[in-house]
Amino acid sequence: LARCWRPTGRRVVLGLPLVVASASGPAALRRGADGEFDSHFQAVARILADGGLGDAILRPGWEFNVAGYAWSALREPRAFAAFWRRTALAMRAAAPGARFVFDWNPNLGDGPVAEAYPGDDVVDVIGLDAYNQSWPFHRDPERRWRHLLDHRNGLRWHRDFAAARGKPRSFPEWGTGT
């Protein structure tokens, strides 16, 4: 990765699966929060830093409020937050000279998003993945835009949540369509 990316002069943004191997679900989140996977994330941190990617923007457990991901926080948001926190601390400790940027990144969707927040001291950026898609229930563009703005975890929520913590915002994944 470093050999391919470093010559571009651009900063790399990586989504990091928050569970490893065959681990998934609430039990895996608790195991991660207890440190079982620390060595995995420490190795990733060293590889990135040693490869000249110590300024990477990292998105551990992206879109954690989506049910389909093995690291979904829907059932245990506090275990997710503890695991995410531990991952960020382990990676920073493993590569102390790196300047990783940790982007906490829900999806515009449902779920206990705020309850899965790991803390201001480990989150550098508050991201939101948002897609302007015309699902059958949002064919009208104005209604669709209101949904994006006013959804429980929508654009207004994102703005207010980040501002309350003094954090910059990002949109790591976004798109528009019909």
Language-model segments: which ranges?
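Substrate-binding cleft of extracellular glycoside hydrolase catalytic domains
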Residues: 2-102
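Alpha-helical scaffolding within the catalytic cores
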Residues: 2-3, 39-46, 106-118, 149-161
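Glycoside hydrolase catalytic-domain groove-lining segments
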Residues: 3-4, 121-177
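Active-site beta-loop-alpha junctions enriched in small/polar residues
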Residues: 17-19, 61-63, 103-107, 131-133, ...
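Short catalytic/ligand-binding loop motif for oxyanion handling, primarily in non-cytosolic enzymes
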Residues: 21-24, 65-70, 109-111, 134-136, ...
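Extracytoplasmic, non-cytosolic globular domains
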Residues: 76-92, 98-105, 124, 154, ...
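Short, surface-exposed loop/turn motifs that are enriched in glycine and acidic residues
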Residues: 77, 116, 144-148
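Acidic/histidine-rich catalytic cores of soluble enzymes
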Residues: 102-112, 116-134
